[in-house]
Regions:
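Membrane-embedded alpha-helical bundles that constitute the cytochrome b-like, heme-associated redox core
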Residues: 1-121
Length: 121
């Protein structure tokens, strides 16, 4: 009895499962840590929280970079979830591809907008 392993094996489907599950967990942890850092800065600051305080928190380059890294992580987190929804629930390939392309364009636009907001371009 011959066993057909290796390069002749037929694999069906995308099989993103474990990688995407891990990616969403890593991005979720990164977003949670960012929330803790942001809350610590807000809670440890003296005086009322106003525009000047918020602008001061996000004025340093390391905070801008950290915020942008978290935004990119969140956009990837969103992409994995939306792609899974489109793949699971939208059966016509043309509609699914259109929705995926629209999602990518929208998320890239959100990243560009985040750059404009953070660095006031």
């Amino acid at each position: 009895m011959a066993v057909n392993y290796g390069s002749k094996r037929v694999v069906v489907g995308a099989h993103y499962g474990l990688r995407d599950w891990l990616a969403q967990r890593v991005t979720a942890v990164l977003m949670a840590l960012f929330t803790v850092v942001l809350l610590a800065q807000v809670l440890l600051s003296k005086g009322p929280i106003g525009y000047d305080k918020w602008a001061g928190i996000f004025s340093t380059q390391w905070m801008k970079f950290l915020t942008f890294a978290v935004i990119i992580a969140m956009l990837y987190h969103v992409w994995v979830g939306m792609r899974d929804i489109w793949m699971d629930y939208v059966k016509p390939v043309s509609i699914r591809l259109s929705l995926q392309v629209f999602s990518i364009v929208w998320l890239v636009g959100c990243a560009g907008w985040a750059i404009q907001v953070l660095w006031r371009l």
